[in-house]
Amino acid sequence: MYIADLHIHSRYSMATSKFLTPEYLDLWARKKGIHILGTGDFTHPLWREELKEKLEPAEPGLYKLKPRLRLAEIPSSSFDPRFIVSGEISTIYKKNGRTRKVHSLILLPGLDVADRLSEELEKIGNIHSDGRPILGLDCHDLLDMALTICPEAMYIPAHIWTPHFSVFGAFSGFDSMEECFEELTPHIHAVETGLSSDPPMNWSVPSLSRYQLISNSDAHSPSKLGREATLLNTELSYKDIYTAIQTGNGLAGTLEFFPQEGKYFMDGHRKCGVCLTPEEAVKLKGICPVCGKKLTTGVLHRVQDLAALSVPDPSGNIQTSSGKLQFDNAFSTSKTTVSIPAIRRPFESISPLPELIAAAKGLSSSSVKVSRIYETLLNELGNEFFLLREAKISDIAAVSSENIADAIACLRDGKVHWNPGFDGQFGTMELVHPFRQLNSD
């Protein structure tokens, strides 16, 4: 089983860390337990040159960091992460009388193909100023261009529910794939859930039943890698990854943010501190009750709008052929019943380990003390995904403390309460358990 994070960025993208280099990406992939990492930003000429200089071919269509460039050894993570060529493209254009703003993830089988596609994209607009270029190009035409240059290219609509920049975004997206991609829609086989939605939310939209669901971090710094990830039960090669994502054969599931932690889960207006359920926002006609400005429509609201076949279910569960999959909207007065598609895959809800340590200790996740505890756990027990998902709670307690071990146990049991995210503000976590409060030294 491989853990893959296919959507990330380089330091050439706007608002990203200077440490987004091949060396640090390799290091943090090992810390996190990520086996396959997207390169991000393949359209940027300087980044492509750096990738060619610092990576070497591995299995067909994959790369790895040259051994002499490895920054440090991590005793519990001795594997060599693989890189797959990836990039995100922002397209802004008019279609059917409206301005559309859509982000798309593209995966390619090699840097040579990235060169050819980038040459064509440079004829459309500027690919030098931002690792995630902004182009005045219809998504339909971008998909056509990618497949013409490389029929094995994977085109995946990115974070499909984000309000401002996605295929289904409330403010500048579409109501269907067909409206966006027209006759090329059959070439779309997978979608990226994004941080503010999880599989049950996507399953509630009948039109998405034919698409594979993948999840990635969209990281803008190395430490944010693996916030979400995709599980692959395949061989290591571009061809096998292609098959898994395009057909589901070898796609084992996803690791998910709790959607309430995402920064666009609920409706609201951050400046005024107003966070609302979809029902409350509808009653207010989408207007902030404090300042009178327009609310940002959240992902939950948008999902409910497109889930046309949903019906009320007093039990608060999603009905499936094999039983009940728990899904409580939590912040909505309505529940949802959906027909779960046959291609559904398992998923696990996770939260970054530094945030759990911080919640247990009453500290900021960016504090020096949290970082020190994090590194100790990694060095003594294993990578972050192993700690979150598999390590014995007793071992975690022995290396750190009882309350940190309790926090991880709460995560595994789903005993987490969220103050939900809205209008660009991430949600905050509260662990629901009888904390064994110890001295935090």
Question: Residue spans of the language-model regions?
Answer:
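Histidine-centered divalent metal-coordination motifs
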Residues: 7-11, 159, 220
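Histidine/acidic-residue-rich catalytic or RNA/ligand-binding cores of hydrolases
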Residues: 14-17, 48-52, 165-172, 203, ...
